[in-house]
Amino acid sequence: MKINRHILTLCLLGLTLSLSAYDAVGHRIVAEIAYQNLTDKARTQVDKVLGKHGIVYEASWADEVRSDNKYAYSYQWHYQDLDDNMTSADIKHLLDNPTAEGEHLFFALDTLTARLKKDKNDAEALKFIVHLVGDLHQPLHMGRKDDKGGNKVDFNWFGKKTNLHSVWDGALIENKKMSYSEFSQYLMDKYEPKKAEFKKHNILQSVEAAYAVRNMIYSYDTSDTSNYHYVYFFADKLDEMLYRGGIQLANVLNAIYK
C-alpha cells in the first residue's frame, strides 16, 4: 500500500507535536502571564525580537534544541541540584556564585541575562531566559542529584507508569484539562490580589519558594497512593509556582528592557 509522502509527513509531525507539547503547556502558561505583565516598552521590544506573542510560541524552544549537538552544552542549564536542608544563606551563596556547583541553571540565567542586557536583540538569549525562568519555578528542576530531580523516582499516574519529575513537568498541568491560555487567565484572576506582592519578589525569593515546594514533594507520604489526593494536596502549590514564574519572568525582562 502506498502512502502519500506529504500525508505521512503531516502524520509524523502531528505525532511529534503530541509528544512534545505535553510539557510545553507549563512553559506557555509562564510566558503568557509574563507577557501580560510586561511594560509597554518591554513588550514592544520582546515582540520585535521574537514576533508578536512570540514569547509564548518560543517558550519551549530551549527544550526542542537540546537534542541538537550545536546546543549540547545547554543540557545542564535546565536544572540546579540542591541538597536537602539548605538555608536561605546557602541558596543566596549559590546565586551569588553561580559557577560554584558547575554551569547549571543559576549560571545560565546569570550569563544569559548579562548577554541580553549587552545585546537587547539577542533572540537566542531571550528564548533561553523565557524557558529557564520557567524551569526555575518547577520545583524538581532543583531536586536531588542522586535521583536526577525525581527522574529516577517511579510514579504510578492513574494507571500509567511514569516518574516523579514527569508528574511535575506536565501530568499535574494536563490534569487541569485547560489550554495554556485558559490556565494562564485562571491564574491571573486567582492571584490578582497577590500580584503586587509577588512583583516585589526577586530571584532569591522565587528560588526559596520553589525549594520549599520541592521539599514538600520529597516529604510527601508515599503510602498514600491515591493520585486524587496528590492532585488536591499540591493544587495550590502548582498554581502558585506557575504564576510566580510568569511574574518573575516579567520582572527580569522589564529590568532588561527598561
Residue ranges and their predicted role:
Residues 140-141:
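Transmembrane alpha-helix/helix-exit interface in multi-pass inner-membrane proteins
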